[in-house]
């Protein structure tokens, strides 16, 4: 009998030792759409944060199409899974609010990052950079190579994308005083779809024969526009610029379709989003003036809308694109 008890105890210990160690905190990183290099890079940072924290599992998820309706389905599934936090880059600032409010009512911490949710649908928002600075930067990237000024157009993501719309408004506001000889002739939307973005870029070139630059504040649109300029033999005539991943865009800096682009580090952005979400799960407070941890990225101080910015955008050109294309 004693031997049986010893064997039973030994077996129980063996089972406990063999059992997998489950993460205590589950944070969902919800992106606009899967298969987007920017968000894949953000996920790398998110997984880095999870590994650093040790007791966190990151669930990387999102729809296949960049629509609010598809994101709502993802949110509802995460509520059913009873995740601890949702960190979302929103396809629409308002349409997601009811689903995210439901999540918060269930005790799930909710933050938005990259592309924001209306304040009533989240606890805080992490901007990749300061909105006015991004708007000024994307215009400056075109203006720097147009000493005599000229016509430019913007190829954005979806018409409801919170971040792109804010950057475009900031860019427009900067034109009269900072770039008076730059004429913005059109803003079109490619919905972060490469086929539609290609068609919109072709449409701009056809509609505006004096077009000097296409500015795309989206990593999908900027690649599509640069490919169109390359294919139509317009290198040196139409400059493509905007926000781009160096790894995806290097060929267009190399061939001259673009002189320069900018971006923040999406790896850092995903990392910071997970760190902030985890801070809330652990009892951190999201309120104006509060300071929360972004790990190796420092601290985020919230403004009166419970928003904060991570870092300034960084410019990539022939001098550094090779180096950074190997990183992200």
Question: What are the roles of these predicted feature ranges?
Answer:
Residues 17-23:
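Sec/Tat signal peptide C-region and signal peptidase I cleavage site
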Residues 26-49, 53, 59-73, 83, ...:
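Extracytoplasmic "Venus flytrap"
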Residues 38-52, 134-138, 162-182, 196, ...:
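Short, solvent-exposed amphipathic alpha-helices that sit
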Residues 52-64, 151-154, 177-192:
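Short beta-strand elements in bilobed, periplasmic/extracellular small-molecule ligand-binding domains
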Residues 71, 126-152, 166, 194-198, ...:
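Hydrophobic alpha-helical segments within soluble ligand-binding/sensing domains
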Residues 85-104, 171, 190-252:
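Hydrophobic alpha-helical
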Residues 93-133, 140-144, 151, 246-259:
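Flexible loop/hinge segments that line or gate small-molecule binding clefts
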Residues 159-163, 181, 276-328:
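Hinge/cleft segment of the Venus flytrap/periplasmic-binding protein
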């Amino acid at each position: 009998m004693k031997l049986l008890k010893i064997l039973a105890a030994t077996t129980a210990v063996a089972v406990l030792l063999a059992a997998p160690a489950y993460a205590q905190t589950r944070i969902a990183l919800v992106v606009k759409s899967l298969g987007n290099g920017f968000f894949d890079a953000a996920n790398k940072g998110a997984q880095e944060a999870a590994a650093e924290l040790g007791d966190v599992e990151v669930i990387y998820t999102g729809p296949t199409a960049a629509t609010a309706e598809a994101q709502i389905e993802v949110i509802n599934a995460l509520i059913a899974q009873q995740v601890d936090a949702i960190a979302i880059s929103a396809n629409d600032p308002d349409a997601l609010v009811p689903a995210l409010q439901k999540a918060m009512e269930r005790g799930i911490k909710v933050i938005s990052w990259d592309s924001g949710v209306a304040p009533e649908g989240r606890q805080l928002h992490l901007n990749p950079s300061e909105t006015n600075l991004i708007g000024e930067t994307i215009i400056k990237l075109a203006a720097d190579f147009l000493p005599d000024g000229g016509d430019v157009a913007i190829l954005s993501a979806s018409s409801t994308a919170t971040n792109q719309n804010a950057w475009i408004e900031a860019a427009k506001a900067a034109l009269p005083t900072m770039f008076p000889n730059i004429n913005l002739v059109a803003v079109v939307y490619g919905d972060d779809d490469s086929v539609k973005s290609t068609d919109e870029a072709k449409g701009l070139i056809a509609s505006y024969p004096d077009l000097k630059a296409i500015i795309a504040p989206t990593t999908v649109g900027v690649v599509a526009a640069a490919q169109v300029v390359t294919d139509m033999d317009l290198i040196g005539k139409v400059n493509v610029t905007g926000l781009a991943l160096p790894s995806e865009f290097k060929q267009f800096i190399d061939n001259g379709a673009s002189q320069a682009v900018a971006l923040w580090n999406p790896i850092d952005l995903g990392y910071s989003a997970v760190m902030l979400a985890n801070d809330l799960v652990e009892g951190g407070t999201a309120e104006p003036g509060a300071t929360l941890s972004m790990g190796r990225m420092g601290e985020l101080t919230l403004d009166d809308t419970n928003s904060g910015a991570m870092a300034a955008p960084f410019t990539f050109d022939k001098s550094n694109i090779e180096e950074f294309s190997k990183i992200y």
